[in-house]
């Protein structure tokens, strides 16, 4: 695995992700996603794709605001803010319409045929706190 191959795969993935194209084409068949804070884990190209889409377009109408990224031989990361509006069920919290902004990081394991693993360092407790604060009655 070379830095050039990792760069090509990651650039293609981000271009597809941000343009609304089929970003899952850059996943291996057995790709996995792990949410590190909760330990939640999904496997398979379609399942990982659906999780990313649901988080950005169903649970929230959200987008990342990139802070920094890096690529090495077989590995990559992106650090961003997750910015959006709460539009769907999140855990036991119904849609609130609240605006959220939380920092997060995703790391990627990359092999010759695509992205094999994603680990989302997403502060789920902070998201919950922002939603609960927004939906609390004014005093």
Predicted regions and their residues:
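C-terminal and inter-domain tail/linker signature
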Residues: 1-139
């Amino acid at each position: 695995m070379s830095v050039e191959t990792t760069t090509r795969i990651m650039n293609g993935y981000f271009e597809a992700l941000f343009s609304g194209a089929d970003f899952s084409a850059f996943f291996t068949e057995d790709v996995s996603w792990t949410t590190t804070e909760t330990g939640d884990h999904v496997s398979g190209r379609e399942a990982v794709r659906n999780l990313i889409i649901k988080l950005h377009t169903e649970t929230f109408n959200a987008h990342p605001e990139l802070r920094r990224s890096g690529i090495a031989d077989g590995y990559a990361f992106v650090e961003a803010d997750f910015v959006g509006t709460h539009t769907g069920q999140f855990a036991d919290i119904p849609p609130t319409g609240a605006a959220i902004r939380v920092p997060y990081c995703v790391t990627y394991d990359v092999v010759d045929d695509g992205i094999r693993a994603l680990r989302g360092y997403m502060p789920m407790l902070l998201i919950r706190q922002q939603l609960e604060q927004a939906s609390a009655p004014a005093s």
